[in-house]
C-alpha cells in the first residue's frame, strides 16, 4: 500500500523507508497526490515488464523456456558445459567452489546451483560474440554468487521471474529458494529495450 508523504517528511527517511519496505510512496503537493517515489530496482522491473508484455514473441519465448525446464529439456551439472563450449567461464566457476547442480549441502552452506533450459543455450549461441561472452561471464559468475541481488523482479503476468540486462541481452531466470537453485529460463536479444546498457551493480 502506498504511504503518503507530506511536506514535513524528511526525504532521506522516506527513501530509507522505500528501500526497506518496497512501499511506493505518494508525494503530496497542495494536499493532492503529485508524484510517486519507488526504488530504482522496482521501477526497472516495471519498465522491463511493460516492454516484454508488449512483445508477444518475447513472452512466448519465456513461456517456452519455462516449459522446457518443467519437461526436463535442460542442462544441469556437467551438462552446463554446453553453455560455455570453450570452457572459459564454467571452469572458473567450478574451481571457485560454486555449485552447478542441486546437491545436498552442509549446514550453513548458502551456495546456489544452476540449471538452464535448452532454449537459453540456443539463444546464447545466437548472440554476438562479445555479448555472449559477457552473458556467460554473468551466468557463471555473479548470477550464482548473488542471484537475488543480480536481477530485478518482473511484474504482472511475468511475476516471480527476475531479469538482468547484460549488454544487449536480457537474462530471464527464476529462483527456487528451497533447493537453492537458479533456473535459467531464457536469454533474449533485446537491442534497444529500455533500461541500463550493462549488467546491474546495485
Residue spans for each PLM region:
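Short, small/polar residue-rich loop motifs at catalytic or cofactor-binding pockets
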Residues: 19-21, 109
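Non-catalytic interaction/Regulatory regions outside core domains
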Residues: 1-5, 9, 78, 82-106
Amino acid at each position: 500500500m502506498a504511504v503518503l508523504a507530506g511536506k514535513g517528511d524528511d526525504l532521506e527517511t522516506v527513501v530509507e523507508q522505500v528501500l526497506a519496505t518496497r512501499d511506493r510512496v505518494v508525494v503530496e503537493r497542495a494536499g493532492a497526490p503529485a508524484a510517486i517515489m519507488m526504488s530504482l530496482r522496482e521501477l526497472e522491473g516495471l519498465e522491463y515488464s511493460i516492454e516484454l508484455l508488449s512483445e508477444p514473441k518475447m513472452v512466448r519465448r519465456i513461456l517456452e523456456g519455462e516449459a522446457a525446464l518443467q519437461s526436463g529439456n535442460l542442462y544441469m551439472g556437467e551438462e552446463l558445459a554446453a553453455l560455455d563450449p570453450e570452457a572459459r567461464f564454467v571452469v572458473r566457476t567450478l574451481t571457485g567452489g560454486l555449485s552447478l547442480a542441486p546437491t545436498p549441502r552442509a549446514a550453513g552452506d548458502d551456495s546456489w546451483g544452476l540449471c538452464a533450459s535448452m532454449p537459453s543455450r540456443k539463444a546464447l549461441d545466437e548472440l554476438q560474440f562479445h555479448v555472449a561472452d559477457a552473458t556467460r561471464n554473468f551466468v557463471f559468475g555473479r548470477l550464482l554468487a548473488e542471484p537475488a541481488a543480480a536481477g530485478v523482479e518482473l511484474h504482472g503476468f511475468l511475476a516471480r521471474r527476475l531479469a538482468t540486462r547484460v549488454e544487449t541481452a536480457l537474462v530471464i531466470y527464476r529462483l527456487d529458494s528451497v533447493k537453492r537453485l537458479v533456473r535459467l529460463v531464457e536469454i533474449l536479444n533485446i537491442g534497444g529495450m529500455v533500461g541500463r546498457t550493462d549488467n546491474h551493480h546495485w
